[in-house]
């Protein structure tokens, strides 16, 4: 009887079909002669490794002549897949061989069902392999270099799906392509002929281990030979590391290095045959914090967000807050001081007298609103950094019928030097009256921040609208550009606008109302740096929102730039219209 001796020392095919109970299976031997259903014996001729690579469909799938299996010294553990029980009945137990699943319906040698099954090309072409092919752990040295017929080593290309992949052009079984399925991650090959079933699968734990296999001994199936059958790019580029994107660079590790998939994806079965990794949506920018981080942030805001008298200036920040934009007011959001001095007109070629006139008209309107409705006459010498700095002295009394003109607060303020920059506190009664006024200012601001015309009255409303239009025309819509960026930030649920200005708090509130900024600046987010400076205001803001959020400072002056540098905050300088447009563009692209 002729023997077939293949290149691998671990896999020899020998034996005879004379045994009535079928072939004897040893640890590294198996019969090379097969029996057909009519009882005839088919013998295989000795082949070299290069000849076996070109064997066509009339070669048996059971004779192991395919070089991808014959020369790979496959362990006898998976050989039960090539011994259909209807051909070689045997009652002899083989403990080293896994039992054949009952659902396996393999056809006998020589029948045409294999060709029919292999022609079901669509069953294989639509299955992307999410990890190592066939559920087998890394082939070790096989991935680093695969021997071809010529003996040269080739690297596995990232565009090639696996050594035994099936392409759409395989109409006949190729040598070494065994009629059983390989376990995929969440799926298996299944055709109408029932040859490939999900239960009939091989995993790494059942038959493949490094001690039994000589992985680099695959001499055939060069990757260039069947390159046309492989999908050119089965994996999206963002799921591959940069070190493996070149098909010509050998790798010392496994060729396919996929990034860690999101949790919950690895255990899901592939139910859609056309499913790809591209269906996984990465988290949106910016990334949300975990629940524990948000709880800690909330507790930080409650415990540390208090003023110098241990009062809470504002509600605790939103648990999802991730970015805080700290704005300057004059010459950043609005053009006001440079109108009064005429510097804006000189810079942009406008008429200086017209510019100064518009500035004076706006200044008069600002202080008129502050004096008439915001108690500026009473509070000018009792300026605060934040609207809630004196809220701890408020007893919550109903102010609907309270008469601010007759409570004696102005006389007490002028006769006693109680409103000092150092925050010296007066009597309890006087401090309560001060707190009443700031509470009333807060109520007016929240009521009219979207309807300043209702606060001014019909006559002043028309003058205000006319003045706003003239200033916008002179300044080339500076405020409109700033409002676009402010509104975009305000529309985000994880961002907030903060205003820090060197103007006193009450005139600053009047400016915000008259320039239509109340909708993007809640009164709790407005700080006056008149007494303590912007750097100290930045420290208060950090204490309020915590250090886990990202702070961005936007302004035109040196003071805010130095404060931002000290606290390691990014600084966006505003010196022209183009800076405002660039800021809005960066916000639209979510760079900020």
From Swiss-Prot:
Q: Which cofactor does it need?
A: Mg(2+)
The entry's cellular-component GO terms read: cytoplasm; nuclear body; nucleoplasm; nucleus; protein-DNA complex
Q: How is it modified after translation?
A: Sumoylated with SUMO1.
Please give the start and end residues of each transmembrane region: none
Enumerate the active-site residues.
Answer: 328, 330
Question: Which UniProt key words apply to this protein?
Answer: Activator, Chromatin regulator, Cytoplasm, Deafness, Developmental protein, Disease variant, DNA damage, DNA repair, Hydrolase, Intellectual disability, Magnesium, Metal-binding, Nucleus, Protein phosphatase, Transcription, Transcription regulation, Ubl conjugation
Quote the InterPro entries the UniProt record gives: EYA (IPR028472), EYA_dom (IPR006545), EYA_dom_metazoan (IPR042577), EYA_dom_sf (IPR038102)
Entry annotated with the keyword Nucleus: yes
The cofactor note from the UniProt entry for this protein is: Binds 1 Mg(2+) ion per subunit.
Comp. bias regions, Low complexity: 8-26, 64-75, 241-253
Tissue distribution of the protein: In the embryo, highly expressed in kidney with lower levels in brain. Weakly expressed in lung. In the adult, highly expressed in heart and skeletal muscle. Weakly expressed in brain and liver. No expression in eye or kidney.
**What is one Pfam family matched by this protein?**
Hydrolase
Q: Where is the composition biased (Polar residues)?
A: 28-63, 254-287
Chain intervals with Basic and acidic residues compositional bias: 288-303
- What family is this? Belongs to the HAD-like hydrolase superfamily. EYA family.
Q: What is this protein called?
A: Protein phosphatase EYA1
Q: Which organism is it from?
A: Homo sapiens (Human)
Tell me the lineage of the source organism: Eukaryota, Metazoa, Chordata, Craniata, Vertebrata
């Amino acid at each position: 009887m002729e023997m077939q001796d293949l290149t691998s020392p671990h896999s020899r095919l020998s034996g005879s079909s004379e045994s009535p109970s079928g072939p004897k299976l040893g640890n590294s031997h198996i019969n090379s002669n097969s029996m057909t259903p009519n009882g005839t014996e088919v013998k295989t001729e000795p082949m070299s490794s290069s000849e076996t690579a070109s064997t066509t469909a009339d070669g048996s799938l059971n004779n192991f002549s395919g070089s991808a299996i014959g020369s790979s010294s496959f362990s006898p553990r998976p050989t039960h897949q090539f011994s259909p029980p209807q051909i070689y009945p045997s009652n002899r137990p083989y403990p080293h061989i896994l039992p054949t699943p009952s659902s396996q319906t393999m056809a006998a040698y020589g029948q045409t069902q294999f060709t029919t099954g292999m022609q079901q090309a669509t069953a294989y072409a639509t299955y992307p392999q999410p990890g190592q092919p066939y559920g087998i752990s890394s082939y070790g040295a096989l991935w680093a270099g695969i021997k071809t017929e010529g003996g040269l080593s080739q690297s596995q290309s990232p565009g090639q799906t696996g050594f035994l992949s099936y392409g759409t052009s395989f109409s006949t079984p190729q040598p070494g392509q065994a009629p059983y399925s390989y376990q995929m991650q969440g799926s298996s090959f299944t055709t109408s002929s029932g040859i490939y079933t999900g239960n009939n699968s091989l995993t790494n734990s059942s038959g493949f281990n490094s001690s039994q296999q000589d992985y680099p001994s695959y001499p055939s199936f060069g990757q260039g030979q069947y390159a046309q059958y492989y999908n050119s790019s089965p994996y999206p580029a963002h799921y591959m590391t940069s070190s493996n994107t070149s098909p010509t660079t050998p790798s010392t590790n496994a060729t396919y290095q996929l990034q860690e998939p999101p949790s919950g994806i690895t255990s899901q079965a592939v139910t859609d045959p056309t499913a790809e990794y591209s269906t996984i949506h990465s988290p949106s920018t910016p990334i949300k914090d975990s629940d524990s981080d948000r709880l800690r942030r909330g507790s930080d805001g409650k415990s540390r967000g208090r003023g110098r008298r241990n009062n809470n200036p504002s509600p605790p920040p939103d648990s999802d807050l991730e970015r805080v934009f700290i704005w300057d007011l004059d010459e950043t959001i609005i053009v006001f001081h440079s109108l009064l001095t005429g510097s804006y007109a000189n810079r942009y070629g406008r008429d200086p007298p017209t510019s100064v006139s518009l500035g004076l008209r706006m200044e008069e309107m600002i202080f008129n609103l502050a004096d008439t409705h915001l108690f500026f006459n009473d509070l000018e010498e009792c300026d605060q950094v934040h609207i809630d700095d004196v809220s701890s002295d408020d007893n919550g009394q109903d102010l609907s019928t309270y008469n601010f003109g007759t409570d004696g607060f102005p006389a007490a303020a002028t006769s006693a030097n109680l409103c000092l920059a150092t925050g010296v506190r007066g009597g309890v009664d006087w401090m309560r009256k001060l707190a009443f006024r700031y509470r009333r200012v807060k109520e007016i601001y929240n009521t009219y921040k979207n309807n300043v015309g209702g606060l001014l009255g019909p006559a002043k409303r028309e003058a205000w609208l006319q003045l706003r239009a003239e200033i916008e025309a002179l300044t080339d819509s500076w405020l409109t550009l700033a409002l676009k960026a402010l509104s975009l930030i305000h529309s985000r649920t994880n961002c907030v606008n903060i205003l820090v200005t060197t103007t006193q708090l009450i005139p600053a509130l009047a400016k915000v109302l008259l320039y239509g900024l109340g909708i993007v600046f809640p009164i709790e987010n407005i700080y006056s740096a008149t007494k303590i400076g912007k750097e100290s205001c930045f420290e208060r803001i950090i204490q309020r929102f915590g250090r886990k959020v990202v702070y961005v400072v936007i302004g035109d002056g040196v003071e805010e730039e130095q404060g931002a540098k000290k606290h390691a905050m990014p600084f966006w300088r505003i010196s022209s219209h183009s800076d405002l447009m660039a800021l809005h563009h960066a916000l639209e692209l979510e760079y900020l």
